[in-house]
Amino acid sequence: MNSLLMITACLVLIGTVWAKKDGYLVDKTGCKKTCYKLGENDFCNRECKWKHIGGSYGYCYGFGCYCEGMSDSTPTWPLPNKRCGKK
């Protein structure tokens, strides 16, 4: 029983360490980072792969840069308690 509990705890820990998130990049005003060329987009891909973002791939979806594989600390749209362009 103890070994089963220990294995479960290890799996949960591994999942949280390797967890990556997907979402829309936000600019300094809290809005989605805008793009116009839908689908594969060099601008979005470059923005997502920046060192402080840590994403693995980015593309334009719904006129916003959508990133995959970002670190959990990267803010994504919508920001809690903040509307786009409002304080």
Curated annotation (Swiss-Prot):
The modification Cysteine amide is found at residue 84. Keywords: Amidation, Disulfide bond, Ion channel impairing toxin, Neurotoxin, Secreted, Signal, Toxin, Voltage-gated sodium channel impairing toxin. Its main location: secreted. The keyword Signal applies. Residues 20-85 form the LCN-type CS-alpha/beta domain. One of its GO terms (biological process) is defense response. It is found in: Secreted. Residues 1-19 form the signal peptide. It comes from the Eukaryota. Disulfide bonds join 31-84, 35-60, 44-65, 48-67. It holds the Pfam family Toxin_3. Expressed by the venom gland. The keyword RNA-binding does not apply. Gene3D superfamilies: Knottin, scorpion toxin-like. GO terms for cellular component: extracellular region. One of its GO terms (molecular function) is toxin activity. Has the structural arrangement of an alpha-helix connected to antiparallel beta-sheets by disulfide bonds (CS-alpha/beta). Beta toxins bind voltage-independently at site-4 of sodium channels (Nav) and shift the voltage of activation toward more negative potentials thereby affecting sodium channel activation and promoting spontaneous and repetitive firing. Is possibly lethal to mice, freshwater shrimp and crickets. Belongs to the long (4 C-C) scorpion toxin superfamily. Sodium channel inhibitor family. Beta subfamily. This is Beta-toxin Ct17. It comes from Centruroides tecomanus.
